[in-house]
Structure formats: C-alpha cells, structure tokens
C-alpha cells in the first residue's frame, strides 16, 4: 500500500500533472509522512492483538513448569501431585550406544500427543532459554519472572532442544528432550513416576 502510493505520486510528478509549486510544497511531504504512518498503525494494532491472543491457551490439557539451573533443568507437572524431577545431560562415558552425544538426558519430559501443552519457564540462578526448535518453541527463562509458551505435538516421537542463552561455562551441557507419547502411555508413565517419587 505504501509503495503503491509512493509510485503513484512519483508517476504524477514525472508526468508533470502536479504543478511546480505543488512539487516543492509541504503538502506532498505531509502526505508522504502521514499516510504511511496511518497504514502502519492500521497494520500494527490488529497484529499486536493477534500476537497476544496466540500466546494464551484457554484450557491446556497439561501445564509443565521448566526451571533452568546451572547446568540442568528441573521440571514440575503442576497438574499432578508430587510429579517433579531434575533432568541432567548423560555424560558421554555413560551414554548407551546409538544415542546422541550432548543431547540425551537422564529424565525426559514426557507429554501426551495431540494435547495442548502450556510450559511455564523460569530460572533459579541466571538467564537461560528453553528451546526445542522442532516444536517451534523458544522461551527465555529469567530469574524471578514466569514466561509461558505452548505447543501441540501431532505425532509420537522424541524432540531435542538445548538452552539457547549463554549461561556460563557449561551452557552447552543443558539439553532438553521432549518425548511425545499416546495418552495411555503418558498416564502409565506419570502414575509410575508419581508412585516412585512418593517412596
């Protein structure tokens, strides 16, 4: 819209349909300034509203709290009682054959597939960032502040990510592994983990 207006006014000037006093006048400069500003405002207002609407999930099926520490992640399933764990990277010397070096963890985040998941992200010490690129998720973890993001997995699988904020010497040793499973498997996993943590 802005380019069209500029090209239209430029073509009028080149065809000399505007008088010489209009070309040098302030009216044209005023139009070139105000009209693009109005167009930008008309584009920005609905965009900002949609941006904030996309950030909110009305009723997620599961809420997960991810807390970044130097240099591991803590997870709390807030919809379950006593379902929390720490997730550390598996050292290369202890890594089973066939697993990814620097990406495998001792406790994966397990979520049910085809369910809206809300992730509340914070940090306990310094800035971190909870990022899983294949899910389109990246949220900064800031001490004393709760940020949120959401995602839905459409297929079972394992999704890898890492802390994407330089947070110290072992920054590259903070992998994130999200495992998407069918609902029945998730329910059995959560009940097994809840019963083992209560012992």
Curated annotation (Swiss-Prot):
Residues annotated for Cu cation A2 binding in this entry: 163, 165, 167, 171
Identification of the protein by name: Cytochrome c oxidase subunit 2
Keyword Lyase: no
Membrane side Mitochondrial matrix: residue ranges: 14-26
Keywords for the protein's UniProt record, in alphabetical order: Copper, Electron transport, Magnesium, Membrane, Metal-binding, Mitochondrion, Mitochondrion inner membrane, Respiratory chain, Translocase, Transmembrane, Transmembrane helix, Transport
Gene name per UniProt: MT-CO2
Record field: transmembrane: 1-13, 27-54
Top-level taxon of the source organism: Eukaryota
Reaction equations catalysed: 4 Fe(II)-[cytochrome c] + O2 + 8 H(+)(in) = 4 Fe(III)-[cytochrome c] + 2 H2O + 4 H(+)(out)
Stretches of the chain forming a coiled coil according to its record: none
Membrane topology: Multi-pass membrane protein
């Amino acid at each position: 819209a802005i380019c069209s207006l500029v090209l239209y006014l430029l073509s009028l000037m080149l065809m000399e349909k505007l008088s010489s006093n209009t070309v040098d006048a302030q009216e044209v400069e005023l139009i070139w300034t105000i009209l693009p500003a109005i167009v930008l405002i008309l584009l920005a207002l609905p965009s900002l509203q949609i941006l904030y609407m996309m950030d909110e999930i009305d009723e997620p099926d599961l809420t997960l709290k991810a807390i970044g520490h130097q240099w591991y992640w803590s997870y709390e399933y807030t919809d379950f009682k006593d379902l929390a764990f720490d997730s550390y990277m598996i050292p290369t010397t202890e890594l089973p054959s066939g697993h990814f070096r620097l990406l495998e963890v001792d406790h994966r985040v397990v979520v049910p597939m085809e369910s809206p998941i809300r992730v509340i992200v914070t940090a306990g010490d310094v800035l971190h960032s909870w990022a899983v690129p294949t899910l389109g998720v990246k949220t900064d973890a800031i001490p004393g502040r709760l940020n949120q993001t959401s995602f839905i997995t459409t297929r079972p699988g394992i999704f890898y990510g890492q802390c994407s904020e330089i947070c110290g010497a072992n920054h590259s040793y903070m992998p994130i592994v999200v495992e998407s499973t069918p609902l029945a498997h998730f329910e059995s996993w959560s009940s097994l983990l809840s019963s083992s943590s209560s012992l």
